[in-house]
């Protein structure tokens, strides 16, 4: 940040995952690092905001097949579970790219220091009918 590389009203966006706030099996170190990333975004959001009016946000994306994610034991289960829990279904990588572009636009000029969930509603659902059906006796 000391290099003065950002233009005024610029935007910085990082990708994270809700495991930064919740427990997910076998996501241990990655979850710790995502929590740290979200904290850095808040800290730098304040610094860059006051110095250059630069916005700093994180996007908490649906579980998405990536090189990093493929190394997490049971990751396919995360994807299937989130799909069953999300009213709108999982957001794809392309959906995330489109959403990210909006954070670089002037339409989000006053959005900063936020962790924005982009997960089809998964982060706010306690339990879905699709998941409950798995536990119901027939």
Range-by-range predicted roles:
Residues 1, 45, 49, 73, ...:
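Generic helix-packing signal
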Residues 2-50, 61-65, 89, 122:
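Catalytic loop of short-chain dehydrogenase/reductase
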Residues 9, 53-55, 111-113:
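Short, small/polar-rich loop/turn modules that mediate ligand/substrate recognition or access, typified
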Residues 11, 67, 105-108:
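Short linear Ser/Thr-Pro motifs
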Residues 18, 26-27, 70-72, 115-116, ...:
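Short amphipathic alpha-helical segments
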Residues 51, 61-86, 95, 126-138:
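A glycine/serine/threonine-rich, flexible loop-to-helix segment
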Residues 58, 76-111, 116-120:
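C-terminal helical subdomain
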Residues 108-111, 115-138:
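C-terminal tail/cap regions
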């Amino acid at each position: 940040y000391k290099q003065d590389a950002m233009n005024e009203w610029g935007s910085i966006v990082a990708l994270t995952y809700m495991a930064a706030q919740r427990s997910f099996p076998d996501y241990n170190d990655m979850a710790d690092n995502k929590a740290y990333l979200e904290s850095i975004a808040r800290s730098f959001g304040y610094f860059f905001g006051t110095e250059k009016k630069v916005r700093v946000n994180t996007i908490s994306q649906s579980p998405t097949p990536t090189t990093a994610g493929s190394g997490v034991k049971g990751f396919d289960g995360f994807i299937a579970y989130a799909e069953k829990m999300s009213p709108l279904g999982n957001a794809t990588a392309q959906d995330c790219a489109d959403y990210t572009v909006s954070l670089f636009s002037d339409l989000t000029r006053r959005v900063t220091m936020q962790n924005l969930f982009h997960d089809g509603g998964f982060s706010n659902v306690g339990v879905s009918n699709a998941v409950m059906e798995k536990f119901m006796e027939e």
